[in-house]
Amino acid sequence: MDNLFSHSDDALPGPVDPVESLEPVICTVTVPGPVAQAFAGFTDHTHLWWPLDSQGVYGPGSYVEFEENLIVETADDGRTAVWGSIDDWQPPLSFHASWHPGTTAIWSTELRVAFRAVEAGTELRLFHNGWEGAEDPAATRAAYAVGWPTVLDRFVRFMGGAAQD
């Protein structure tokens, strides 16, 4: 008897796919003011605070906006890049989008941003996952783990809050 167990080795689970083991990037910040104001600041006035110099496709001088069911960056020469497609829009509480700035929808990840009232104003919780959709899942996740805090710090300051540590 080669095996003490009643099942064969073929029935054992295989190795875990490294992409499936990548954790979501979750960031939470608090801004002063009511939920509706925070939602509008994030979605209607993105062009005023988004750090396009470091977190954009075309860099300074471009313009980012939520346009119908898309998130779009427009360069000063008129070129456009679709950052994502919104598939769940629940103002002023949340939105969900496929997310692919600088690449195509084929390589998209998943982004959900939710807003809720807290004693100090509004809490924004960003949940970014779906790394298996990215061309290079581990590198994409690592870049967003660094990038989202920078982006959200700019949003907090735009909304009148103190810079996050």
Predicted regions and their residues:
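Hydrophobic pocket/interface hotspot
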Residues: 38-42, 71, 86, 95-97, ...
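Ser/Thr-centric signal marking residues that sit
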Residues: 43-46, 109, 122
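Short beta-edge strand/loop motif at the mouth of beta-sheet-based domains
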Residues: 26-27, 44-83, 94
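Short, hydrophobic/aromatic-enriched beta-strand segments in well-ordered soluble domains
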Residues: 29, 126-129
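Amphipathic alpha-helical segments
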Residues: 32-49
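Short acidic N-proximal helix/loop "leader" segments that mark the beginning
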Residues: 1-26
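Hydrophobic-ligand binding "helix-grip"
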Residues: 2-4, 63, 76-120, 129-132
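A conserved amphipathic terminal alpha-helix motif
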Residues: 2-10, 130-165
